């Protein structure tokens, strides 16, 4: 998992507030987009339209959501909590 506190390069590249896109990959379950949005709404409330794309074999889906990030801490906590969803395999 990405540790943004130790990754000064990412912190230096971002100027807050800014748009930040998360790409969450997980099992192809109908609840995946809803669960991703639940976590995002806790830390960055807003009206989001997730983009869902199936994998070639259909076993996995990727859910992309762009938020209005206000701090590096917000970005990091979302990476952590999105990665803790049991049906999620990777967060980019």
UniProtKB/Swiss-Prot annotation:
One Pfam family here: DUF493
InterPro entries: UPF0250_YbeD-like, YbeD-like_sf
Domain of life from the UniProt record: Bacteria
GO cellular component, one term: cytosol
NCBIfam families the UniProt entry points to: PRK04998.1
Membership in a protein family: Belongs to the UPF0250 family.
Protein name: UPF0250 protein VC_0945
Organism: Vibrio cholerae serotype O1 (strain ATCC 39315 / El Tor Inaba N16961)
């Amino acid at each position: 998992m990405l540790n943004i506190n130790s990754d000064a390069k990412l912190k230096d590249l971002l100027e807050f507030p800014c748009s930040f896109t998360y790409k969450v990959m997980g099992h192809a379950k109908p609840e995946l987009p809803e669960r991703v949005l639940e976590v995002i709404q806790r830390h960055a409330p807003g009206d989001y339209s997730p983009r869902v794309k199936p994998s070639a074999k259909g076993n996995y889906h990727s859910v992309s959501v762009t938020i209005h990030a206000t701090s590096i801490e917000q970005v990091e906590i979302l990476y952590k909590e999105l990665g803790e969803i049991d049906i999620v395999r990777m967060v980019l």
